[in-house]
Amino acid sequence: MTLDRAVNPPRSSGRKALRRAVSGKTVLVTGASFGLGEAVARELAAAGATVLLVARTAERLEALAAELNSNGGRAFSYPADLTDEVAAAELAKTITERHGALDVIVNNAGKSMRRSLHLQYDRFHDFERTIGINYLGPIRLLLGLLPPMREAGRGQIINISTVGVRIAPGPRWGAYQASKGAFDVWLRSVTPELRADGLTVTTAYMALMYTRMSAPTPIMRVLPGLYPEEAAQIVARAIVRRPRALAPWWVWPADVMSTALPGPTAAFMRVWARATRDTEAASAGGRR
């Protein structure tokens, strides 16, 4: 087993199983223009799903949809800013009118942010942006898409989360982890209601992925992680097996340790905070 497999959630390369699970089904993927969302869209289209691509970047979405369709897939692009309440409501209405109750929703759109507290004194918008994209945005969309799914008594929601909401929060990640944690708690809270109506909810707690969001942080380049195409296999596993959660094996003991040994955990975080620095982009963005 390679190191990247050991520190990330289990993934599957069972193409036949994925095809059986999604062929002829309609799957919506947010954040589909880059990174994991794009990789998931490609994987699902190749497996026979009708893929609805959602992101803010219209040109990227349209190009991806055209490529998938030219390769024999079936894809539709829906450019939208989910932080806009009106746009999110209109998107949900349009998708429901055109496609009916969805079979799978992959909540992947997100905004990462790593910045020290002293650089955020005059950047309250950092928190507004992360909350808007990572918490309120997906709720806005789901509130519009869930009614027909619950009425149909079927469907699956897959939330792409982070191990950071399951273990002791790391320094400089406050805005990001708080927003991801907020959605995680909300989704776990409504899951019993959704399951009562026949829906399945799966959360994939991802460790490090090599994407545009992680690229600016130097230490992320040397830690073991997954490329988007590899991480897409975790989503494929979630669709095929429909578990409640997917997480690296070490998340549970790390969570227990942080609770049972708060002193050593806090000491480690202080060492980590001193050993790491803000990126140039974060530092420049924090100076006003």
Positions of the model-derived regions?
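Conserved glycine-rich cofactor-binding loop
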Residues: 26, 31-34
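Conserved glycine-rich Rossmann-like NAD(P)H-binding loop of the short-chain dehydrogenase/reductase
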Residues: 49-64
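The beta1-alpha1 cofactor-binding region of Rossmann-like NAD(H)/NADP(H)-dependent oxidoreductases
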Residues: 59, 79-90
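Conserved mid-core segment of classical short-chain dehydrogenase/reductases
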Residues: 112-128, 172
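Active-site helix of classical SDR
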Residues: 142, 179
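Residue(s) in the substrate-gating loop at a strand-loop-helix junction
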Residues: 162
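C-terminal helical subdomain
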Residues: 203, 220-259
